[in-house]
Design a protein with these regions (language model features):
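Regulatory and interdomain segments flanking nucleotide-handling catalytic cores
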Residues: 1-222
């Protein structure tokens, strides 16, 4: 749906990803673009991720669960600052995000700058309305980021640390060239149970960011 000014009334998720400490280090943008393309395979993608400027990439999604998956995967990597803007966009959307505009894009820029700041407690920030809901999402994301960091520090990072609990342990073990027991231990070390429990909660909160929680929507209709 589009309003009279040409802005979408549907919520969109604009994710800006900036390489951390890129000065003097190899450009990892091609790597992360290939990684995101493989991970999402078009799922929830409205505008594909692409380089915007320098070592920064940006994409537009409409699926909160896909957003959570991308954010957590990049947090495990540890080499990126992430800014998520939630809100309307100006339509029609172009083929590349650097040519797009709208509230969600402004919020994504503000969020990634916040995530890059020295005062940031986690390399991820969220901007959306209502502000209180965005703050709750950011807080939960921060706790997830801390958990992911602890898991990686204990040996849960790398390819094994990114393995998904939804796949068969035998298949994952075969792909990694290790035993099923090693996969199970690796996932436990990487705090997989805690992450699996938190993922749907964060996705739900993201889905409510633009519209507000169910109770608020019922009050508006009354």
């Amino acid at each position: 749906m589009v309003d009279e000014q040409g802005s979408s009334l549907d919520v969109m998720y604009v994710l800006t990803v900036d390489q951390r400490g890129s000065t003097g280090r190899p450009d990892r943008v091609p790597e992360v673009l290939a990684r995101l393309d493989e991970m999402l395979a078009g799922r929830g993608v409205v505008v594909p991720f692409a380089r915007t400027v320098g070592d920064e990439v940006q994409g537009v999604l409409d699926d909160p669960e896909a957003v959570v998956e991308v954010v957590l995967d990049l947090l495990r990597d540890g080499g990126w600052s992430l800014g998520l803007g939630v809100g309307p966009v100006d339509e029609p959307l172009p083929a590349v995000s650097r040519e797009a505009s709208g509230t969600a894009f402004v919020r994504a820029r503000e969020a990634v700058e916040q995530a890059k700041s020295r005062a940031a407690t986690a390399p991820v920030a969220v901007r959306g309305e209502p502000a209180a809901r965005a703050a709750e999402v950011a807080a939960r994301r921060g706790r997830l980021a801390a958990g992911v960091g602890r898991g990686a520090a204990r040996g849960g990072g790398g390819r094994g640390g990114r393995a998904r609990g939804g796949g068969a342990g035998k298949d994952v073990a075969r792909a990694l060239g290790v035993s099923e027991q090693a996969v199970s231990q690796r996932l436990r070390t990487a705090l997989w149970p805690e992450e699996a429990a938190a993922r749907p909660v964060v996705a739900r909160l993201l889905g409510e960011l633009h519209e507000g929680p169910p109770a608020d929507r019922q009050e508006e209709k009354a």
